[in-house]
Amino acid sequence: MNDLYPALLLTLLAGLSTGIGSAMALVVKHTNTRFLTLALGFSAGVMLYVSFVELLPQSEETLLAGMPSQAAAWVATLAFFGGIFFIWAIDQLVPDVENPHEMSYIGRMEERVPDSMRLNRMGLFTAAAIAIHNFPEGMAVFFSALSNQNLGIVIATTIALHNIPEGMAIAVPIYFATKSRKKAFTYSFLSGLAEPLGAIVGFAILKPWLSPPVFGSVLAAVAGIMVYISLDELLPTAEEYGEHHLAISGLIAGMAVMALSLLLLA
């Protein structure tokens, strides 16, 4: 596994981008919501395109090394929806009021006069919620990078963009509750460490059985996880921050850039 350490490094960098989000929230008075809308839409486009055009076909190709073509198609399909169910089940563990993808206060908190204890609780629960979400995201980056390092770089970048507003979601309420930039940044930074931790745990569990059928199934599950993240988190959050058409423009641009990248790297 010569690609093990680069894959882990990519996962770590993607996770720690929550720290970038918290720094932006603490330094910049007003968040550029149009940029966030475009960036989140772009990330969704990249993840959707790469899931259907690259990961699923690669999953079936890997599965074919250990089973007939029809069986490979069935396993890839079941693993894809299994990945969707896995991330959906994790989402159900997080109450809506603490769910980082249901918040609309980022960049507008200074306009409110909220209760500091409630804000602090919200920030801490948001950090825990994001840490839970980061587990499967870390696995997605890690196993994609193990499969193809260039693909891993692309997915790590899109997950990193996705993590920036999540870092803001943690830092803003904690800062306004405690007036401590250090505490707000620390909680945000630590929540990002769940991504490499998720990668390590996932790899440790699957390593004894990491045959072509298992690896192919994991790739299909990763595709399912990324599709769910795109449709349930990235696009709704993008639209919450800005205009519908701007989010869709980012989505199409992300697909186009990913398509061009795959053609150039082929």
Curated annotation (Swiss-Prot):
| HAMAP family membership | ZupT
InterPro entries, sorted: ZIP, Zn_transptr_ZupT
From which domain of life does this come?
A: Bacteria
Q: Which residues bind Zn(2+)?
A: E137, H162, E166
In which compartments does the protein localize? Cell membrane
Task: Identify its membrane topology class.
Answer: Multi-pass membrane protein
Protein name listed in UniProt: Zinc transporter ZupT
Q: Which residues bind Fe(2+)?
A: N134, E137, N163, E166, E195
Q: Does the keyword Iron apply?
A: yes
Which GO molecular function annotations are given, in alphabetical order?
metal ion binding; zinc ion transmembrane transporter activity
Catalysed conversion reaction: Zn(2+)(in) = Zn(2+)(out)
One GO cellular component term, please give it.
plasma membrane
What NCBIfam families does this protein map onto? PRK04201.1
Family membership noted in the UniProt record: Belongs to the ZIP transporter (TC 2.A.5) family. ZupT subfamily.
Function noted in UniProt:
Mediates zinc uptake. May also transport other divalent cations.
The UniProt keyword set, sorted, is: Cell membrane, Ion transport, Iron, Membrane, Metal-binding, Transmembrane, Transmembrane helix, Transport, Zinc, Zinc transport
Segments traversing the membrane: 8-28, 35-55, 70-90, 123-143, 152-172, 185-205, 209-229, 246-266
Per the record, the gene is: zupT
